[in-house]
């Protein structure tokens, strides 16, 4: 999803969205004050009901936090219950000190402890408790995320590690000697900031504080989604490799949102504890973290408001089931998960977005016949560059093997400045491996690689190589399908690609002009706001080429750029490459010999990881070794 549902609704129906939001907010603000009414008043609510709704609001904050990492960054955490519980324990320490006064907490006296553990120091102060609420879960999340993302752990392995982390925390807190109350945890709270915890006025204040946290969390999520940072997270989820080849380091973005998410959970846990009156290790149970994932899945990932509703629906149903039919709750929860997976894979809220009809979709994907349009104006100096012939890329004796299979054997190759080099060869010749080596995806065992006369590619990673000026297009067009055409080009542009820049930076007029010019060159101007996933195959090919062009690279590596294109699209692609050659150096891997004939400047034939022949297309076509390889004689 390109934008969260709340943003989409605001754009499509601003008045309706505003009214709905205001009515809901007013209702939640008024709700706790109904607890002050006499018990026999028809509008009065009980303290139990107020506590239940406050607890659900805390869970809603957790759902938003999980949606930020799972719905946007694609990181399924099964351990957010740990951060929630740590925030609760930090608040519980403060409440236990308030209840004990100058003495030891009750559980410590029961265990015959004579003094407070060192880590309880200062816990009687509310400000220090707030610091613990934020710093302890935040630091743990940062350290865990740093090593996990640095090790490139992702997918199911990341989920398993988060589940193991929360399970380890639960086992640790179950032990009496750790100083956290063991199996019973913390309870018996009496005072908070000088007010009785059980007083109705205190519960109203806690409810309103929870509501403020929920609104702030939702507003923060919306703000992030509107920034370039939110679009980068979406790109991490949908095509992390493409993002790296655009020059971004995903680790920093994932670490930032992961730590932020943990802190939000901790704040929710801190407000949860004084409302329910207890915190124990069961809050760290992996089951609770899995339930949180169900809230997000039910409401709709990447929608922000959906997980809030999902948390409300599931926990409202849980409260009813655990009283009416407690033995069936787990079965009901499993049924919800199965139904959502089978019938609502995008979540219940996402169903509110009506899919386009086949006619509408077809109509939107059709664009003017390419041959009927004038070629895009591309400024270049082909003759000037082609006369230089200084090598932009030099490979010497490159060897790559995988488990004894030699993908590249003593391969040597030079690409000149402004040259358009075509690489051909049968399947398995090493063409894609060659591109992997040049872009840092695969490290050669031996050999020398020099780019632009002074860059040693063998010591650089993919991100550094992208910043140095090498752009790569993959065999299968790889774009950020949840983002618009314009946003794909925006992310790929050559500029600062740090977390801070993505949070604060905005496009200037020069950058917008570059995107507009690129869209015109690619014949995609009319589709600038189209979601990239709705483009035709050929249009995706053009978009990916455009993502390379806005990076302003010196060397473009293009892997089967004409594959799957129509004849008209193929013809225009050939024209485009001929115009680009000179301003850029191009290395094109392609099987379509008709396409090769229209662009061939110099052709290299690979076979079994070695250079078999080089020269003009006519020369390699007459080469006996090439004929033998292609025709088998």
What feature does the model see in each segment?
Residues 596-598:
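A short, surface-exposed alpha-helical micro-motif characterized by mixed small hydrophobic
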Residues 556-560:
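Catalytic Walker B motif of ABC-type/P-loop ATPase nucleotide-binding domains
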Residues 448-467, 505-507:
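ABC ATPase NBD Q-loop/coupling interface
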Residues 2-375:
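Transmembrane alpha-helices and adjacent helix-loop boundaries
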């Amino acid at each position: 999803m390109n934008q969260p549902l709340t943003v989409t609704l605001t754009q499509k129906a601003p008045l309706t969205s505003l009214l709905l939001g205001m009515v809901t907010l007013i209702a939640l603000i008024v709700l706790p004050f109904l607890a002050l009414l006499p018990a026999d008043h028809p509008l009065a609510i009980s303290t139990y009901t107020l506590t239940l709704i406050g607890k659900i609001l805390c869970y809603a904050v957790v759902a938003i936090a999980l949606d930020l990492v799972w719905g946007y960054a694609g990181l399924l955490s099964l351990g957010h219950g740990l951060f929630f519980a740590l925030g609760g324990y930090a608040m519980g320490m403060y409440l236990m000190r308030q209840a004990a006064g100058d003495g030891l907490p009750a559980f410590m006296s029961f265990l015959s402890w004579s003094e407070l553990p060192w880590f309880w120091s200062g816990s009687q102060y509310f400000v220090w408790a707030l610091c613990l609420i934020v710093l302890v879960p935040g630091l743990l999340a940062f350290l865990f995320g740093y090593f996990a993302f640095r090790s490139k752990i992702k997918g199911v392995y990341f989920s398993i590690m988060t589940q193991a982390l929360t399970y380890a925390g639960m086992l640790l807190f179950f032990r009496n000697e750790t100083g956290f109350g063991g199996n019973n945890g913390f309870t018996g709270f009496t005072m908070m900031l000088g007010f009785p915890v059980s007083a109705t006025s205190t519960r109203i204040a806690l409810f309103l504080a929870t509501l403020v946290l929920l609104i702030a969390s939702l507003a923060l999520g919306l703000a992030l989604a509107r920034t370039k940072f939110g679009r980068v997270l979406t790109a991490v989820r949908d095509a992390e490799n493409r993002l790296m080849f655009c020059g971004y380091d995903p680790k920093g973005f994932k670490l930032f949102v992961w730590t932020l998410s943990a802190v939000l959970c901790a704040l929710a846990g801190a407000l949860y504890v004084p409302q329910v009156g207890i915190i124990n290790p069961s809050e760290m149970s992996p089951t609770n973290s899995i339930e949180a994932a169900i809230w997000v899945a039910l409401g709709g990932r990447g929608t922000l408001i959906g997980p809030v509703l999902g948390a409300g629906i599931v926990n409202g149903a849980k409260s009813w089931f655990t009283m009416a039919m407690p033995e069936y709750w787990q079965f009901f929860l499993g049924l919800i998960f199965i139904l959502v997976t089978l019938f609502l894979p995008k979540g219940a809220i996402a169903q509110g977005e009506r899919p386009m009809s086949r006619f509408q979709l077809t109509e939107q994907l059709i664009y003017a016949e390419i041959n009927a349009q004038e070629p895009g104006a591309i400024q270049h100096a082909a003759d000037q560059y082609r006369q230089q012939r200084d090598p932009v890329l030099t490979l010497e004796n490159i060897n790559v093997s995988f488990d004894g299979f030699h993908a590249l054997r003593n391969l040597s190759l030079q690409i000149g400045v402004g040259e358009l080099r075509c690489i051909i060869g049968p399947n398995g010749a090493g063409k894609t491996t060659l591109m992997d080596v040049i872009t840092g995806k695969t490290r050669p065992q031996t050999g020398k690689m020099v780019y632009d006369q002074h860059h040693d590619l063998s010591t650089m990673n993919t991100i550094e190589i992208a910043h140095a000026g090498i752009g790569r297009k993959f065999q299968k067009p790889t774009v950020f399908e949840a983002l618009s055409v314009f946003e794909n080009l925006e992310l790929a542009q050559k500029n600062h690609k740090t977390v801070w820049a993505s949070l604060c930076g905005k496009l200037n007029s020069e950058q917008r002009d570059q995107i507009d010019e690129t869209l015109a060159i690619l014949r995609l101007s009319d589709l600038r706001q189209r979601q990239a996933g709705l483009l035709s195959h050929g249009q995706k090919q053009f978009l990916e080429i455009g993502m390379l062009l806005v990076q302003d690279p010196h060397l473009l590596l293009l892997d089967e750029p004409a594959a799957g294109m129509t004849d008209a699209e193929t013809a225009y692609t050939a024209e485009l490459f001929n115009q680009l050659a000179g301003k850029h150096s191009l290395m094109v891997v392609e099987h379509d010999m008709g396409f090769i004939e229209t662009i061939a400047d110099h052709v290299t034939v690979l076979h079994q990881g070695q250079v078999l022949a080089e020269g003009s297309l006519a020369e390699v076509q007459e080469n006996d070794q090439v004929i033998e390889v292609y025709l088998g004689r």
